[in-house]
Amino acid sequence: MRTISLFILALSVVFTTLPQPSRACTEARIKAEDGTVVIGRSMEFAQPLDSNIVVQPRGQVNVSTLPDGRDGIKWTSKYGVMYLDGFGIDVAVDGMNEAGLSLGSLFFPGAAQYQDMKGAKRSRTMVVNDLPLYILQNFATVDEVKEALPKLTVVGIHTPALQNIVIPAHFSVYEPDGTGIIVEYTKDGLNIYDSVGIMTNSPAYPWHVTNLNNYVGLNSVNAEPIVVDGVSFAATGQGSGLNGIPGDPSPPARFVRAAAMAYLAAKTPNADGAMNLAVHILNTVDIPLGTVRDFADKESFGDYTQWIVVKDLANRVLYFRTYGNTALRSVDMKKFDMSPGAKRFTMPVDGGAGAVTDVTAGLKPSS
C-alpha cells in the first residue's frame, strides 16, 4: 500500500489481444468553505454508454460470477446506492451510497492488470466489473475500503457488451469530508494512494502527481511587465499567469488543467457554489464529438463527453447533464426509501426536455 503526500493542491498491461485506445475521463474534488464536498466527473467514451441512473435500496443479494462461470464472493448490501451504469450491464460507472461515500470508475488503459485467480479463495474473489458496487454497497469510510481490498482477489473478465475486452479501470473513493484514495491494480499488484483531489486516466497515478511539479509556476495573477534594454514588455490581455497550462484533451493535460482550476478558483461558500464551480471546471475539459479520433477514417469518431455528474456528498444529491441535453438535472437520494425490500428505480440519463428555455415573455417594455 502506498501513500502520496497532498502537496501543491492545498494547493496494464491488460490481458487482452487488442490494443486499447485511451478513453478520457476527468474527476475533481471541490471543498466549500462550509465544509461541503462535491465530486465532479466527466465521462468520455466513443461507444454510446446508454447510461441509466439507478437507485437501489439496502438488502440486495449479490454474487460475482467468475470467468469460469462459477460463483465468487457473495454479499448482501449494507447501504442503499445511487449510481450510473453503462453498456446495458449492472456496473457502477460512478455513484455514491447513503453514507455519502463516493466512487468513480475511470478508464486506465495500458496500465491496469488484475490479479491471478489461481490459488485464490473463491469466496473472496470477484471480477473487476463488480468491484464498484461491492464498495458502494458495503462501506461507509475510506479506511474500511483500505482494510477490505487487500483481503480480496480482483480478476479481469471479458465484457461482451464492450467488444469483449477486459475493462481496464482504476477507481476513486471519497468520504463526505473529502478524504479520498485512488485504487489501481497494476503489474505491481494492488496500489492505494492518497488522492490529491484530481483524477484522469493513464499513466499510473504517481506519474500524474509528479508531473504537477512541472507546473508549480501557474498562477491566477497576471505577469508583471518587464523592461529589457529600455523597452517595456507587458502581457496582452488577461490570463498571463496561466501561460503554459496544457490545453489538449490528453489525460496528463486534463489532470494539470483540472488541478490548476480547482486550486486557483475563488473559494465557494456552500454546496451550491461548489456544485457550480465543479461544472465550470468540467467545462474546461469538455470534448466535442469529432475533435478526438482513434483513426483518420471520417466515419470513425473517438471519445466525446457523453455526460458529467456532480455529487454533493453532504446532501446526497447527484447532478448530471448529457451531451444532447446540457441542462443540469438532479436526483435527491434522500427522497427514496432505502430499506430492504423497497423498490429499485431507474431512469435513462439521455433525453429530457432540452437545454433551451424560451424567456421571450419575460421581456417587459421599458422607457
Model region roles, listed by residue range:
Residues M1-L6:
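Positively charged n-region of N-terminal signal peptides that target proteins for export
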Residues F7-T17:
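Bacterial N-terminal signal peptides
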Residues R23-V38, A46, N52, I157-T159, ...:
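C-terminus-biased signal that marks the final domain/tail of proteins
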Residues A24-S123, G156:
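A contiguous strand-loop segment
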Residues F45-Q47, P109-A111, D188-L190, G324-L328:
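Short, surface-exposed beta-strand-loop junctions and turns on beta-sheet-rich folds
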Residues P48-L49, A112-Y114, I181-E184, N191-S195, ...:
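Short helix/loop capping segments that flank catalytic or ligand/cofactor-binding pockets
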Residues K121-H158, A271-H280:
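Proteins synthesized as precursors that undergo proteolytic processing into mature forms
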Residues V142, K146-Y185:
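Aromatic- and glycine-enriched pocket-lining scaffold segments that form the walls
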